[in-house]
């Protein structure tokens, strides 16, 4: 079989202007970037304001493993197969961060014959949205540092006289706004800034990856440009010496930060291998952020097609949970069905049983033990009142006997149905039955419900998420986290939903605990207020907001050939 890059480079593409017209966009609603991608202007939202809406399908997965579960492959394959059976469908996915592309995970365009193409354009830069987020974010960091510098050297009276601005009295120890970078770079996690003569005052800071920026979450959760401007104004950059919030609006930088992102708020239109449309927009990670593509992209697609396929990052305890409790809570766009992706390899890897046996060989004991993880995720999705279809992403090494065993086991659960997907190897022809089953599931009446109400306390929300959402015995709050609960409550933010930043490699906080962990306590070391995005992040265990590169990073394989074409992406 050809590599992903070879398949992408040999694809016959529809001109993006024609693709947009087929989708229902007007020429003036598209800003073309060559023939392969286009920005979609938000004026389409107003034009289609009264349009009936299609059905939203959320794709999630079991607990991820190093073998790859194929969630994006399934999302794109399902979109292709829906088109093949005569349904008007559109995928809505996140823009890949270059951190994972050059790190361990690789690209995020799907794979095999279920890809968004050209995949190299999607995985590297695309239309520059992530760079815009980085620039806007770092402008905020530069502005707060500059304001601190000038206020410190001049004092209140002279600063106000010279600048015509109010003295903010910034507390250097309470500057909450780091800088960001779209690469994995662990040495920047903790830094001191302001060193050297006339550069201070010195204060502790750090860098996060851009996907963890609150601006990225704002991009994904905004309803329109005006909403994004208002949210950016609410960003909490620091506290003053009296413990009061200093926002981007207070600093006078919110307008300029928004100006940098006026094009980034427009989704990018691309296509799958069989010419189905795909809107790519925003890229928050699901472990350290809320892990879903934008509300705007979903809104546009739902007004143009019958079925919108979107996905949440990592397992159902991560991106799917945040899709429900954060994204849907803010958008009101309720899903009609869910697709839960699994593989035989994933179940064996999640069994918790150490084995020297090749994971590609039949292993009844590990498969049956690992099924508990899939069963947990089925029940977790069903908890939200959404019909769930299990998609088994087939690998070439899978045996029919093990596949049939798994289908029979799934049919004894709360799942609506179970289908084997060959989208990776067969493209649109490989997920036809999955498409039919998903259509039937979406035609049933979803009874969507949230996990907790807005008016619950922050501590109650954290406890509910840990105990009901993960099956934990409870939570433990550090002294810092307890103080932050009190602080955020006193500032009027207790109504916000919570976003757990934890490992994706286990349902629990501990990546070593496989399968369905029990009797564990979720340790919450700190909270982060995201007043603009509209949620409070809980940092669980040792999760980092700036990843690091491994000993064999992905960039080692990436180069250009003699013709100047990119090679090694996948």
Swiss-Prot record:
Pathway(s) annotated for this protein in UniProt: One-carbon metabolism; tetrahydrofolate interconversion
Residue numbers binding ATP: 65-72
Coiled-coil annotated residue ranges, if any: none
Keyword terms: ATP-binding, Ligase, Nucleotide-binding, One-carbon metabolism
Enzyme Commission number(s) from the entry: 6.3.4.3
Catalytic activity: (6S)-5,6,7,8-tetrahydrofolate + formate + ATP = (6R)-10-formyltetrahydrofolate + ADP + phosphate
One Gene Ontology MF term: ATP binding
GO biological process, one term: tetrahydrofolate interconversion
InterPro entries, A to Z: Formate_THF_ligase, Formate_THF_ligase_CS, P-loop_NTPase
HAMAP family in the record: FTHFS
Family: Belongs to the formate--tetrahydrofolate ligase family.
Protein's name in the database: Formate--tetrahydrofolate ligase
Native species: Shewanella putrefaciens (strain CN-32 / ATCC BAA-453)
